[in-house]
Design a protein with these regions (language model features):
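All-alpha prenyltransferase/terpene-synthase fold signal
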Residues: 1-145
Length: 145
């Protein structure tokens, strides 16, 4: 079972799967890439924040599946020169959010959610500007926390 398919994850993010389907615009390889990112990033966040238990099996499985996706997914391979910098930016945003000073803690959740930019970029790659804008209007407001 994917990390974000667990009942507690679905309860926390009930629209996530459907949003990934919307973003991917019927491109199966694009869906596989963003769904794998979503799972891996959420698992990693839970490991770092230690707010939810993560088993070694879950961590190992998601690491392998993410690595396999980066190595073999045709959508990623076709777009790796634009997607890899987006992943780098998301990783950096996460660190900046975690290191935010007390005066700037209000911005931490926004910085830590830089992976949204990856999903927005994928929407552009599979459907162009209008699709990206439509997806952003749905995705950027799905989680009010």
């Amino acid at each position: 079972m994917d990390y974000c398919s667990k009942p507690e994850e679905v309860a926390q993010n009930p629209l996530a799967f459907r949003l990934m389907v919307l973003i991917s615009n019927d491109n199966e390889a694009a869906f596989d890439f963003i769904w794998r990112c979503w799972n891996f990033f959420h698992l990693l966040d839970d490991l770092i924040d230690r707010d939810k238990p993560v088993t070694i099996q879950e961590a190992s499985r998601e690491l392998f599946l993410f690595t396999q996706t980066i190595a073999l997914n045709p959508f990623f391979q076709q777009n790796k020169f634009s997607l890899l910098p987006m992943i780098l930016n998301a990783c950096n945003g996460w660190v900046v959010g975690e290191e935010a000073s007390e005066a700037n803690k209000q911005y931490a959740p926004v910085l830590k959610c830089s992976d949204f930019n990856i999903y927005s970029h994928v929407a552009f790659l599979v459907g162009g500007w209008e699709h990206m804008r439509y997806v952003d209007s749905k995705f950027r407001t799905y989680d009010k926390e």
